[in-house]
Amino acid sequence: MSWFNVLKKNEGWTGELSDKKKGLLKATPKMKVDIPKFDYPDNEKEIPAVLAAMKDKKLEPAEMKETDVNARDMFFDLVDDEEEDYSDLIKDLEIYTIREKVRYNRARPYQVSDKIEKPKTHTIDTPSFPSGHSIESFGIAVALAHKFPDKKKALMDVAEKVSDARVEMGVHYPSDKKVGKQIGEMIGKAYIREVMSDADS
């Protein structure tokens, strides 16, 4: 099935990007990362998995809120480092995230199924695929784990927690998380290779 036909079958995200997000689309990333082209996912087929995750929530409401709005803090609270020191990484994660989201323009689960209410959060002002929280979480986790190898498991656990929470909230599909994780790890490794290695030498 062609991309055009899939897009017709799965109506895209309906919303307006903020000026900040539009600005990121024009920005040039510091690191060159060759993001592969992914198959366009099927919204309807993934709705049951989203509903199941929402029903069997693993996180308490307070934890869910923290993963939604304070995800970065969860990583830097684990290590002796400051978020500001990773501004280039975070900016690139944001740039690549919005590029991919606009490229696929996938509708959010609540836009596809009337069984899912629109969540009360400001973190759904972009298309669904891939998950920006997953991209950022795994990108940061990979970079920090390189510098703090003794914290690797804890950092990766937080990345999984943040990513899973997005599906449990009903704002993402499982494939959003899966691909977001893959992209985040790619960017994190590029940062290690191109930035952290230079700093170490």
Residue ranges and their predicted role:
Residues M1:
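Extracellular cell-wall/glycan-interacting regions and their flexible linkers
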Residues F4-M169, M186, A190, V195:
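Hydrophobic alpha-helical bundle signature of multipass membrane enzymes
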Residues M169-V179:
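A structural-propensity feature for long, helix-poor, extended segments
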Residues M196-S201:
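Short, flexible loop/turn segments with low-complexity composition
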